[in-house]
Amino acid sequence: LWEYNINFTIQREIPDNHYFYYTTLYPIHPDYQKRLATYRPFGSPIDSPAGIQGKATQFVMILDALQLRLLEKIRSDLAGYSVVRSTSPLDNRAIWLEIFAGGIHKGNSCQTLLKKLNINCKEVAGLGNDYNDIDFLDICAEAYLVANAPVNLQRHYKLVKSDKEEGFTEFISKVL
């Protein structure tokens, strides 16, 4: 990850995944700075792979507008991993790339749960709000997005009101 010139965090292994390593080798994105400040007690700085001890559950990269053009290159370079785009929960604007072991995403998690519960995907409705919900929504028989989801996702799914305007309530009334 060092070769992309993007700072990142490495979440430690469960149950200690609230602890993380982080880099500050490149100009720091304001959202990244806020994340580090918010969770400072749990973070340890590193400046090379040698600083990493133990296993990891997730990498998080926060991209600025220029770095966003690297998204497909990173996905291609890390083809054996799940590289999931999401919007920052901190500023609701910054683009995060979350990198997990291959096959780890909301869609597979949902399928695993449905299988254990003996429920067919054709019986499932889902509501999402961001890019990290795509894998989950794509397995649902009825897939909805809240109206304040990213515009370029909205043409792919049915829409309900925004999460600020009782979109969840509208979703429930449509699927029940």
For each predicted feature, which ranges?
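Mg2+-dependent phosphoryl-transfer enzymes with acidic/Ser/Thr/Gly-rich catalytic loops
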Residues: 97-176
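Conserved acidic, metal-coordinating active-site core of Asp-based
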Residues: 4-7, 11-125, 134
